Amino acid sequence: MQNPPSLGLIDQFHRKINYLRLSITDRCDFRCVYCMNEDMQFLPRDEVLSLEESLRLVKIFTSLGVTKLRVTGGEPLVRKNIAWLFEGLGQIEGLKEIVLTTNGSQLAHHAHMLKMSRVKRINISLDSLDPMLFKKITRTGDLDKVMLGIDEAIKEGFSNLKLNTVLMKDVNDHEAMDLVNFAINKKMDISFIEEMPLGAINHKRKDTFISNDEVLKKLQAHFNLIPTTFTSGGPAKYWQIANQSTKIGFISCLLYTSPSPRD
């Protein structure tokens, strides 16, 4: 007698789970002011899943119906032997979409490997186009390396590239229009993310918080934005820029129960 077919993974809201988010490290080569203190203490390495364990888990989840994987961190690309993991992920049958979230600092070095490993989409954090301000926000980041990473990803043929930007009042909110124009020129999408009340930081979030509604109003004064029903499977609400391929997404820090999985 055969066992009945598995229904896969179902959550408490009766949604079928086909999306897995895998954080492979809490370590990062940036110390972004909205994310962590400069003297952040990371987990002991022996408390983090090995790459072999991570790959095995993804295979198990794929056998249970997961078809989309997002690899994140920390900064995933600083993990030692990361190429081995992506090469293994790219060989898993049934895994239809692999997505990477990165700060872009190591992207130039890994872009070809990621393309060969069937990574479909890359989200790149970019909070400023000004090298000095970028350094101030990230504390340790080099804007030139991120720009090189973006260009290398484009050269490798990645067409699903998206920028993620955290705007802060009186810090980088004046760059919203320039960042959108940059995305248009690179034929990328861009999402603006409200500063999240997460982690220990060195400033008061109430002083730097700017709502998506404020950002949207500013952008509508310069761009013809058309509401869309487009979704990448996450919480962003998207607007299409008229006569352009670029879409602008807005991600709120207020969480809600959605019929779709989180991005």
How would you describe each model-predicted region?
Residues 251-255:
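Immediate flanking context of iron-sulfur cluster ligation sites
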Residues 219-230:
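Short secondary-structure junctions
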Residues 40-44, 130-137, 199-203:
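A short acidic, helix-capping loop that chelates divalent metal ions and anchors anionic groups
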Residues 51-70, 78-193:
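Radical SAM/AdoMet-radical enzyme domain recognition
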Residues 211-219:
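Gly/Ser/Thr-rich active-site loops/lids in small-molecule metabolic enzymes
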Residues 169-171, 191-212, 228-242:
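Flexible glycine/acidic-rich beta-alpha junction loops that bind and position SAM and/or redox cofactors
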Residues 2-98:
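Conserved alpha-helical substructure of the radical SAM core
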Residues 256-263:
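Conserved small/polar residues in nucleotide/adenosyl-binding loops
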